[in-house]
């Protein structure tokens, strides 16, 4: 549990530095692209999982 706290703290610090440093405007487009790629990969994974007939617990 402590590991998760440290991980999210580091992520929050990096996001704060980038957000207040003016880099946020440039990274919004990259974040959008990564978001849509993640959605596509999720959908492909779901379709392949359903096609194979596996049940996930």
UniProtKB/Swiss-Prot annotation:
<comment type="similarity">
    <text>Belongs to the UPF0391 family.</text>
</comment>
<dbReference type="GO" id="GO:0005886">
    <property type="term" value="C:plasma membrane"/>
</dbReference>
<feature type="transmembrane region" description="Helical">
    <location>
        <begin position="1"/>
        <end position="21"/>
    </location>
</feature>
<keyword id="KW-1133">Transmembrane helix</keyword>
<dbReference type="Pfam" id="PF07043">
    <property type="entry name" value="DUF1328"/>
</dbReference>
<keyword id="KW-0472">Membrane</keyword>
<keyword id="KW-0812">Transmembrane</keyword>
<dbReference type="InterPro" id="IPR009760">
    <property type="entry name" value="DUF1328"/>
</dbReference>
<feature type="transmembrane region" description="Helical">
    <location>
        <begin position="30"/>
        <end position="50"/>
    </location>
</feature>
<protein>
    <recommendedName>
        <fullName>UPF0391 membrane protein BRADO5617</fullName>
    </recommendedName>
</protein>
<keyword id="KW-1003">Cell membrane</keyword>
